[in-house]
Every structure is written in structure tokens, then in C-alpha cells.
């Protein structure tokens, strides 16, 4: 519903302008805004570009040509991106359990969305769109690494996300001006409804919860949430839209839950000597 008459850049700008306004209002009214340094703001600008602007422009652009199922599978690769980037930026060696859970989760999502993946394969998917999806995923992972930095400096997600969303919205505004993209609007109720849902639930609530998780259990384990998001979406679709489960989707769910169990610390014989 966000991919229609309104330009992608404009829709993403609306989303993060609304989200930034809500986040800043919340931290100011609750008195939870922390003191920050110039260096902190430099990193929050980078986080805004990686996690709250460019990555979504890339993902939305990819969504014009490839299915939501393929997007979900590609985005779940953030578990692997985070494992590699944690090693590069923070010297954290990813465990065998993290890699195993990531591969199992991605395989599970592939099975769950197998019909969509087959359809994409049959029609011939634009490699450029797949590239945009992977670029958006890699930018999201870099945003995770910056969040780890904030946590090490004692910055809470409420403060860092509020500023980062604000900077992300400013960056998007600059892109709108540079590219000459118009601020058009879709008067259909579903456009406003989906925009508010994505801004409030998907961004303010979702990212605050996710980045809090990054601070508590680390970026490697927290990234597995990106595997669970589409599973929850399919669960809601089952209840409200009558989604029909197939053998492949049921098996895929089993793989995803197995991967989630590994991340949460369930011990299997082969991984008994590894720490999650």
C-alpha cells in the first residue's frame, strides 16, 4: 500500500518524519532525553542514514519488482551480515550456534515463501532489485553496529533513535530537494492507515524494542528477530485473511522455530560445546 502513486522517497520521508516527531515528543515529555556529545551526534547522523532512511529507500525500491517473500528471505540475511560486521567492527567472533541458527532460519523462510520464490524465478527477477534488497539489508546491519556503539557509550535507544530518526528525516528531505521529487499525497484511506501503522508500530515501537534487544543480547542474536517478523505476519494473515498453510510452509516454520530455539539457548548435541 506504500508502493503506488506516491514516490518511494516521499513515502519514506513521510514515515520517518512522523516517527521522529513522535519519538522526540516522547523522550522530551518523559524526561528520558540523555545528554549527548558532538561525536554521539556524528554517529547518530550515520545511523539515521543507514537505518532510518537509505535502507528503506532500497527495500521499497526492491519491492517494486520482487515479491514480499523474497524480500523477507533476503532481509533475514541480516543475521549473517551482523555476525560478519560484529567481527569486523567489534572483534566479536560469531559462534557456531549463531551461524547455524541463521542458516536454518533463512532456509525456513525460503520454504515458507517457496510459492512466491518460484513465481519470481519463473518471471525472471531483476538482478538490480535483488541488489537493492541486499544493499538495504547491509545498511540495516551497519545501523546495528552503530547501535552497539551507542550501547557501549551508555546511550539508550530512546535517545539515540529519536535523534537518528530526526537526522534520517532531514537526510531524506535533502534527497527530495536534490532529486526534485515532489511531495505528493495519496488520498486513499489505506495509504494513510498503512503509513501511520508503519510509522508508529513498525518504526517507533518496533525499532525501540529491537534496538533495546540489541543492547541486551547483542546484535548477532537480536538480528534473528528479522527472521521472526514475517512468521508473525503470516500468523496474523492466517487469523484475519485465511492464509492456507502448505506442507512446505509448515516445514519452514519448524526450521524457523528451531533456529529461534538455538538463539535462545536450547542445547542440541552437535552444538553442546558452543555458547549461544
For each predicted feature, which ranges?
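Specific transmembrane alpha-helical segments of multi-pass solute transporters/efflux pumps
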Residues: 24-75, 111, 199-217
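Membrane-interface helix termini and inter-helical loops of multi-pass transporters
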Residues: 1-5, 64, 113-126, 177-194, ...
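C-terminal-most transmembrane helix of multi-pass membrane proteins
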Residues: 12-17, 24, 114-115, 191-193, ...
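Helix-helix packing/entry segments at the starts of transmembrane helices
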Residues: 12-14, 71-77, 146-169, 199-239
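Transmembrane alpha-helices of multi-pass small-molecule transport proteins
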Residues: 4-54, 81, 138-146, 161-180, ...
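Hydrophobic/aromatic residues within transmembrane alpha-helices
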Residues: 2, 11, 15, 62, ...
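Juxtamembrane helix-loop boundary signature in multi-pass membrane transporters
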Residues: 33, 77-138, 179, 247, ...
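Specific alpha-helical transmembrane segments that line the substrate/conduction pathway
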Residues: 10-21, 51, 59-102, 136, ...
Amino acid at each position: 500500500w506504500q508502493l503506488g502513486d506516491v514516490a518511494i522517497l516521499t513515502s519514506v520521508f513521510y514515515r520517518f518524519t512522523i516517527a521522529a516527531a513522535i519519538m522526540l515528543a516522547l523522550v522530551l515529555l518523559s524526561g528520558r532525553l540523555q545528554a549527548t556529545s558532538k561525536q554521539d551526534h556524528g554517529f547518530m547522523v550515520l545511523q539515521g542514514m543507514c537505518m532510518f532512511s537509505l535502507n528503506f529507500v532500497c527495500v521499497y525500491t526492491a519491492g517494486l519488482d520482487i515479491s514480499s517473500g523474497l524480500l523477507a528471505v533476503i532481509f533475514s540475511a541480516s543475521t549473517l551480515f551482523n555476525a560478519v560486521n560484529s567481527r569486523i567492527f567489534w572483534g566479536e567472533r560469531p559462534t557456531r550456534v549463531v551461524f547455524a541458527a541463521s542458516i536454518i532460519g533463512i532456509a525456513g523462510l525460503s520454504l515458507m515463501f517457496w510459492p512466491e520464490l518460484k513465481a519470481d524465478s519463473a518471471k525472471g527477477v531483476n538482478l538490480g532489485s535483488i541488489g537493492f534488497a541486499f544493499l538495504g539489508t547491509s545498511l540495516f546491519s551497519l545501523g546495528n553496529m552503530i547501535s552497539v556503539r551507542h550501547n557501549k557509550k551508555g546511550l539508550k535507544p530512546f535517545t539515540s533513535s529519536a535523534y537518528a530518526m530526526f537526522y534520517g528525516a532531514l537526510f531524506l528531505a535533502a534527497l527530495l530537494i536534490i532529486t526534485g521529487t515532489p511531495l505528493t499525497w495519496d488520498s486513499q484511506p489505506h495509504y494513510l492507515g498503512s503509513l501511520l501503522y508503519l510509522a508508529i508500530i513498525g518504526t517507533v515501537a518496533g525499532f525501540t524494542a529491537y534496538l533495546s534487544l540489541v543492547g541486551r543480547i547483542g546484535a548477532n542474536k537480536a538480528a534473528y528477530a528479522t527472521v521472526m517478523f514475517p512468521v508473525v505476519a503470516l500468523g496474523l494473515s492466517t487469523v484475519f485473511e485465511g492464509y492456507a498453510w502448505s506442507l512446505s510452509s509448515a516445514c519452514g516454520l519448524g526450521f524457523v522455530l528451531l533456529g529461534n530455539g538455538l538463539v535462545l539457548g536450547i542445547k542440541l548435541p552437535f552444538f553442546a560445546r558452543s555458547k549461544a
